[in-house]
Amino acid sequence: MEKLARKQVQQLTPYLSARRIGGTGDVWLNANESPFNNEYKTDFARLNRYSECQPKELISAYAAYAGVKPEQTLTSRGADEGIELLIRAFCEPGEDAILYCPPTYGMYGISAETIGVERKTVPLTSDWQLELAGIEANLDNVKLVFVCSPNNPTGNLVKREDIVSLLEMTKDRAIVVMDEAYIDFCPEASTVDLLAQYPNLAILRTLSKAFALAGLRCGFTLANEELINVLLKVIAPYPVPVPVAEIATQALSEAGLARAKFQVLDLNANRAYLQVGLSMIPVLEVFEGWGNYLLVKFPDGDGLFKAAWETGIILRNSPIENCVRISVGNRDECEKTLGFIRNYYA
């Protein structure tokens, strides 16, 4: 059966999500999920009918939240589908390329590889910023440049002036895709205001993080209307199930937004608690984080990761040497994790 698969698929290594890696324990800080399990109501009516391709109430609610027009908003099965839609819509397999800057989110490369589109990489600088000269030197045949801010797994914000420089550099050449999956934890850093000035900008968003709806799989792409219309040509006819649209719309109601804002404040406080506590352990290097996670460099990252795993504290190993990413949980989970690490290095 393997030989019947496309060559790209035969050679593909699937993305190792936190759920694929698994683990057993009672402290799960490996997938940047929210610790809040909010309740929603749905009557499961109309399940005998297909959903709208783009549910109007949901689109209007998210557009209002994001500060854009409904015509600039597309909803999909998580931001991951948005990545795939952009590549399918704008890249010719075997001709065009995408570009991204590791260390960063792995699905940009995997989505391109699955579709048969070339992947170009320009590593981030030593302080996790864009290497603009390297990007410019590699723009031939590039249709999409993916930038994650706050970046996963490093946690930092990409400098706004560098994003503007990149948008100027790629005018009439490529689309800059800003992955803002974690922007709700620092909304002042969003690039949504640049949409009016740059038609080559697309922004990915999700309800998985700050809205505590990772299991719902609901994401958004924000862009100018012309770009959105291109994506509507390739999206599945019924991408958002009826219950998903109903729950997502509730999350974006006045009450839902107030709850999300409160929970973001709580998680940001827990992140600060973790950051201060870990920074007091002399052998650790704690990188400043703006999402719901922190990247920490240990003397022996693999050893710490395995020891935590064995005690039921599930963290996320990183491709960066000796670095482990720690999701921000509730205060009890943060205290347990900090206590374990302190004892490990005592």
From Swiss-Prot:
Record-listed E.C. numbers: 2.6.1.9
Keywords: Amino-acid biosynthesis, Aminotransferase, Histidine biosynthesis, Pyridoxal phosphate, Transferase
InterPro entries in UniProt: Aminotrans_II_pyridoxalP_BS, Aminotransferase_I/II_large, HisP_aminotrans, PyrdxlP-dep_Trfase, PyrdxlP-dep_Trfase_major, PyrdxlP-dep_Trfase_small
Gene Ontology BP annotations: L-histidine biosynthetic process
Cofactor(s) required, per the database record: pyridoxal 5'-phosphate
Pathway in which the depicted protein is active: Amino-acid biosynthesis; L-histidine biosynthesis; L-histidine from 5-phospho-alpha-D-ribose 1-diphosphate: step 7/9
Annotated family: Belongs to the class-II pyridoxal-phosphate-dependent aminotransferase family. Histidinol-phosphate aminotransferase subfamily.
Protein name listed in UniProt: Histidinol-phosphate aminotransferase
